[in-house]
């Protein structure tokens, strides 16, 4: 019960929480009003970096959402050329994470990490089409247990300036395992083959729990 009300936070949030807490204490001695505002901001920092446990649906027939947020695109596209898959057609689901969503990302399937590729870039609004090509991003090329290529892309947004990767090349992942996070508003794209989408544009998703696609 306690962990549902006060979930643990991601390690990336520790220093931000300490800094915000220290500033709050100082401001409370100077001004009750400023201290209260700072306290509210400290609570928001805690809320942003929360890392709640999820009930993972481990089923190789499904892909689960890699992110909390809102589905902004469901389409068929060429695979990402950055990982050498632009010669194949994939379906792609894009999920936008606003600053109030949990920003810890999870793998949509069980399988092996074949490649991780970081691409520096710009910081356009993550909901724009050009964000997939121009923004700072991190690619995870996975192979599911049936041999399908699944690619997850973390895309930094207008405010997000830090992509965190917690996964290694060659690592075997269980469905719903944490793979990283993005700070302060961002987007996750999932490219997949041989699955059919189960979500629609405008639908809210929960990482590790919402079923994105089915074989």
Predicted regions and their residues:
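Contiguous, well-folded functional domains in the mature portion of proteins
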Residues: 1-215
């Amino acid at each position: 019960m306690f962990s549902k009300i006060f979930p643990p936070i991601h390690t990336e949030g520790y220093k931000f929480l300490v800094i915000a807490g220290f500033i709050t204490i100082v401001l409370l001695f100077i001004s009750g009003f400023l201290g209260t505002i700072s306290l509210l901001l400290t609570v928001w920092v805690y809320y942003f970096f929360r890392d709640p446990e999820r009930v993972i649906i481990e089923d190789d027939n499904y892909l689960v959402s890699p992110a909390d947020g809102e589905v902004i695109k469901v389409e068929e596209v060429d695979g990402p050329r950055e990982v050498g898959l632009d010669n194949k057609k994939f379906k792609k689901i894009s999920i936008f994470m606003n600053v109030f969503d949990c920003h810890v990302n999870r793998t949509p399937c069980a399988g092996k990490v074949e490649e991780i590729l970081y691409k520096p870039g710009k910081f356009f609004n993550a909901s724009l089409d050009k964000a997939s090509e121009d923004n700072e991003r991190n690619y995870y090329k996975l192979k599911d247990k049936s041999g399908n290529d699944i690619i997850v892309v973390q895309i930094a947004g207008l405010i997000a300036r830090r992509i965190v990767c917690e996964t290694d090349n060659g690592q075997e992942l269980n469905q719903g395992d944490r793979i990283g996070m993005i700070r302060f508003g961002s987007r996750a794209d999932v490219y997949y083959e041989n699955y059919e989408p189960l979500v629609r544009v405008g639908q809210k998703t929960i990482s590790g729990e919402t079923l994105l696609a089915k074989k």
